[in-house]
Amino acid sequence: MIAHLSGTLFFASDRFVVVDVGGVGYKVRVTLDTLRELRAKADKKVSLWTHTVVREDVLDLYGFQNESELEFFELLISVSGIGPKSALGILNIAPVEHLREAIAQGDASALTKVSGIGSKSAQKIVLELRDKVGGRGDEIMSGTLREEHDAIEGLVARGY
């Protein structure tokens, strides 16, 4: 399927963009963060990682700024009962790193902020993905989160 698009941003609405690739406009559903990034690049070259959804009467493209967002989206839709629109909604509530940490720590309440995700669905997501995202919060932290965590541990160890 279509795994990546590079072209010119032709149009941006509240939930999707149209990327012109060689004279063909591709409608791509995106997260709010991706939308903000792309709007800043109006009429400039843009690149998106994509996930293609094909059903009986639907062919949808979902676009992401980076491979990490795409992989997390694909993890979410691997959970029975979680479709691409719900997964996109989950990605809208927090950065991927925070969502991974919440799932690894078993915090289902973080996911219930999404319309259509109740406590049962959130618990199911946590149950099915906890091992896939690391199982423990400190195993999946990276970048700034890891540095903050290490700094706090160091201060606590010194009695602060």
Mark where each language-model region is.
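Structure-specific DNA junction-binding interface
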Residues: 1-78
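Amphipathic, charged-and-aliphatic alpha-helical interface segments
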Residues: 52, 59-64, 84-103, 124-137
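Glycine- and Gly-Pro-enriched alpha-helical subdomains that act as flexible
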Residues: 112-115
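Charged, well-structured binding/catalytic surfaces in domain cores that contact anionic ligands
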Residues: 121
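Strongly charged, low-complexity linkers/loops
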Residues: 124-160
